[in-house]
Amino acid sequence: MHFFATDAWSQGVHHYLEHFPQCPKGRAADSELAFAVDATPAYLRKPIVATRLRDVYPSVALPHLRFVVILRDPVERLHAYWDTFVQAGVGVNDFKKWVDTTLEKVKTCQKAHGPELWPPPDTGRCDPEVIEGVAAGLYAYQLAYWFKQFTPARFLITSLDAYERAAGAVLRDVSGFIGVSAALLGTAREIGTPSDAQVVKVMGAPPPAAKEALGKFYHPHNAHLHKFLEGQPHAHCSPNLAGLGIGSWAEG
C-alpha cells in the first residue's frame, strides 16, 4: 500500500493499521500468527519513509524494527521500470532509445547538481521521474542513509539473484533474522519457488546495446555498493556478500 512513501500517509496511521490483523497479547513468537510484513519497492529509495517511521512507532518499539532489503541488478530493475511506468514519450516502445534519452537527461542533471543523483535533486532543473527511476538503482547511497537512521545490525540484505540461486538459505537467514522459526516462515515451495521470480521480470532481456550503456553507467555505483557492504560487518548479507551477485553487476 506504500503508506509511508505516498499520499496515503495523509489518511493517518489508523488507516494503515486497518490493513493488518491485531497482534493478540501474550502470543508466543512461534504461534500461528506472530508478525506481519509491510513490503514495497518504494521504501528504500524514499528518505521521508525513515522520518515517518520514527513519527509513527513509539520509541520503545523502534529498536525492534527489522528491515529485509531485496536488491536487484539495477539494469534489470530499470528495464522493468521502463516496461511498467513509461507509458508515453520518446522510447515508449524502444528501450534503447529511451535509455539514450534518459542518460542524456542524467548527464544534464549531473552538470547542474554534481555527480550524486540520490536523493534526486528537487530544484525543478532535472526531470524528476527520469532521475528517480535511474537513482533507485544507486543502492549504496540509500543503504548508507538508512544505516544512519536505524543502525546496520537491523538490516538483512539479500537479492533476487541470491533467492533464485539459494532460496532455502535465504529463507533460513530471514527467519533467524526476524526471530521466528523457519517452519513458521515457510519453505521456498510454499512462499514462492525461485522460478516464481520470473513474474517480476520483463519478457525478454534488455537489448545488448542498452544493457552495455546502462552497465557502464551503473558499474562504479555497483562497485561502490560492494565496497560499502564490505565495510559494514554488523549488517547481515544473505546468503553472504558474494552470494548477492553484485560482482556480476559490477562487470557491466
Spans of model-derived segments:
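N-terminal cationic-hydrophobic initiation segments that often serve targeting/anchoring roles
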Residues: 17, 24, 28, 54-58, ...
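PAPS-dependent sulfotransferase catalytic core
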Residues: 1-43, 61-65, 75-113
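Aromatic-acidic/polar surface patches that form glycan- and anion
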Residues: 5, 9, 30, 42-46, ...
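PAPS-dependent sulfotransferase catalytic domain
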Residues: 49-51, 64-69, 76-173, 177-178, ...
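A cross-domain feature marking catalytic cores of carbohydrate-active enzymes
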Residues: 39-41, 69-71, 207
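Generic structural signal for well-ordered alpha-helices
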Residues: 13-20, 50, 54, 143-144, ...
